[in-house]
Amino acid sequence: MQITIKAHIGGDLGVSGLGLGAQGLKGLNSAASSLGSSVDKLSSTIDKLTSALTSMMFGGALAQGLGASSKGLGMSNQLGQSFGNGAQGASNLLSVPKSGGDALSKMFDKALDDLLGHDTVTKLTNQSNQLANSMLNASQMTQGNMNAFGSGVNNALSSILGNGLGQSMSGFSQPSLGAGGLQGLSGAGAFNQLGNAIGMGVGQNAALSALSNVSTHVDGNNRHFVDKEDRGMAKEIGQFMDQYPEIFGKPEYQKDGWSSPKTDDKSWAKALSKPDDDGMTGASMDKFRQAMGMIKSAVAGDTGNTNLNLRGAGGASLGIDAAVVGDKIANMSLGKLANA
């Protein structure tokens, strides 16, 4: 597994402190420890998602074989060892997929929708709630195909989390499937491409789902708030809005009993993530939703959204900056899926 870590020498790693003797070395050691922890966390996220998605793709059919033969149990052991979980982890993972039952399953199903078409997936789901059993045949349930699929998922997630969703998607194309759908796939290369497609699909859909489901509430006549669980993401969006005051202006607030709103002295990032009791006006919340729409378009690759062509006063590209925020939201969303 190859992970690209973007670090700015001096700032991120504390190298600028090397000339300060013991204090500089202490700073470097602390930064190195922090970087190591970040790499471990990143690897854990990738491993958890790879194991879970491989289980969803192959687990339903294999689960039936676990109690039927020692061969089935052996494949369980091999799959667990392949992803660092051992026999115990594999036995837990190889359960019947809960199609649509949890957040990651929904992202998996959506990735299949994008790949096969919603009608096909719905038809197969109606025939059996075990998607893997309906989509793959017995001859495809080999260790080599599972390893290749897992490697493809791993590579896709490593690219998204290391290089950014936008850059990863720019060089990606969906695999071409014949009339046989997934059952027409044969060989490690085909299953590696399938895993890559599922990994990319899950990453993109995780970001889009997060942006589509930001929860808000109203307290009083014109006091709007982002709910606490979404304020981390709202802060990222607010920082994007702060880069373009000529487009989004400043947030406004209006106390109960006031005839008109006033401009807040807070940045968008702070007003959204750390609001006081006044929150922001409905008009300001609409601007937040406008910004979310721009970021969703960037994540989805929607070149038809002309807002992405706008430029700031200094010439900065709104579309590029929206894509950068989309990358951050994809990473945050994948982390949440892995730890759900």
Curated annotation (Swiss-Prot):
One GO BP: symbiont-mediated perturbation of host programmed cell death
A single cellular component GO annotation: extracellular region
One Pfam family from the record: Harpin
Keyword Secreted: yes
Membrane spanning residue stretches: none
InterPro entries named in the record: HrpN/Z (IPR006961)
Keywords of the record: Hypersensitive response elicitation, Secreted
Basic and acidic residues bias locations: 262-277
Organism domain of life: Bacteria
Subcellular localization, as worded in the UniProt entry: Secreted
Ranges where the record places region Disordered: 254-283
Family: Belongs to the harpin HrpN family.
Function text: Elicits the hypersensitive response (HR) in the plant upon infection. Harpin elicits HR in non-hosts and is also required for pathogenicity in host plants.
Name of the protein in its database record: Harpin HrpN
Gene encoding the protein: hrpN
